[in-house]
């Protein structure tokens, strides 16, 4: 009887510890100083360069405070593209070793409502061919559990690369935001052996009530 009671108490304790560890696994920041849901005014200018409007790359911004200069989309979000400052990031604009394109989305109230991380399609071939692996690193960062993933099938003419075909979409909800990770690795019918689709796209979106 005592063993049964002890086992039940231990199981409850272990479950609580695992739940707490899972909750702690969610990072407080999504990317450096950026957390989706924060006021854009709280984001420092130091460490970030080449701020431009995603829809109008020729329109350069002097600071985050100029986000209103970028045109709004149909959801009233202003998209600002940016890079890491080479003085604070010697490897350039990379996430987990992958060259990336970064975009922050700001609503009319000045709230960061979204963050997009996309592997750079212009990266060198030997780096770009590993681009699909970034998705796994992102999923690991936010905890391996709780992802809802769907594998999509090839369309007409699409072929595997090195024996691997990948078109995957994964979603997960964490406190205050929704995560979407899309990974692709395949060759289109019109691409030669040195050309192929290999990319990861990460979308972090503020949850709405």
Please give the residue ranges for each predicted region.
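Positively charged n-region of N-terminal signal peptides that target proteins for export
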Residues: 1-4
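Bacterial N-terminal signal peptides
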Residues: 7-17
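Non-cytosolic coordination micro-motifs
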Residues: 23-69, 108-209
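Mid-chain, structured segments of secreted extracytoplasmic proteins
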Residues: 65-115
């Amino acid at each position: 009887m005592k063993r049964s009671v002890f086992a039940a108490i231990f199981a409850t304790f272990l479950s609580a510890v695992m739940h707490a560890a899972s909750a702690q696994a969610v990072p407080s920041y999504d990317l450096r100083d950026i957390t989706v849901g924060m006021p854009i005014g709280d984001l420092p200018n130091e460490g970030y360069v080449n701020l431009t409007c995603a829809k109008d790359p020729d329109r350069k911004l002097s600071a985050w405070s100029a986000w209103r200069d970028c045109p709004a989309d149909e959801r009233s979000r202003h998209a600002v593209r940016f890079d890491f400052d080479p003085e604070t990031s010697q490897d350039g604009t990379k996430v987990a070793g992958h060259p990336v394109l970064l975009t922050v989305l700001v609503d009319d109230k000045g709230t960061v409502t979204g963050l997009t991380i996309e592997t750079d399609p212009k990266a060198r071939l030997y780096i770009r061919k590993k681009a699909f692996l970034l998705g796994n690193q992102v999923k690991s960062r936010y905890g391996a559990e709780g992802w809802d993933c769907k594998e999509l099938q090839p369309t007409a003419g699409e072929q595997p690369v090195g024996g691997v075909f990948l078109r995957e979409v994964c979603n997960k909800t964490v406190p205050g935001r929704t995560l979407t990770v899309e990974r692709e690795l395949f060759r289109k019918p019109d691409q030669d052996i040195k050309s192929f689709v290999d990319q990861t796209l990460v979308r972090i979106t503020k949850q709405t009530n």
